[in-house]
C-alpha cells in the first residue's frame, strides 16, 4: 500500500490485514500468538511479524522469532538488527535495518477514519503545536493533530529501544511541513546516551486512502 519512506538500506513492508500473512509464524511466535486474547490482536501480531520477516529476508539473516518484551511490549529484534512494527485496524507494517547502518527506526500507522476527540490535543501537544492547530480550519486541525500524535509515536518507537528513556508526548515539539510531507521535531529532554536536550531531527509522513504513516530513522 505505502511505498517505502526509507533509504535502500532500510527494508520496509506493508500488508493488508484482510489477506493471509505471507510469512508464517515461527514456532515460538505461534506459541505466543495463542496467549493473545482476541482474534483482532492475533491478526495484528501475525501480519506484523510477517512484515518483519519479509523485511529481514532482504539481509539474508537466519530467521529468528521476533517476540515481545513482557515489560515494555517492544519487539525483541536479533542483535544485529534495528526495527519497528506497527498496525492500525486495516494494515500492518514493519521496517528493518542493520545496526551497522542505522541506530533506530520508528514507524506508526493511524486510521483517519477513526473519530478522535480534539480535546486530547491538550495532552498530546505543547503550546506551540496548539497555537498552530488553533489557526487551522476544524477538519485540517483534526488532521494535523493526528499527524502530530503519530509522529510522536514514531519518535518514541525509534528512541526508546536504544536509550531506554520513556518519552512523553510533550517531550517533543513537532512542526509539520505539508508541502514536503515531512515533520521536524525537537526534544526538550535527553535520551540517555543517544540524544541531548535540544536534539532536532526530521521524519516523513504519508496519507493514502485515509491511512496515515509516519516514519523516522537515525
Where are the predicted features?
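Core catalytic alpha/beta fold that binds nucleotide/phospho-ligands
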Residues: 1-218
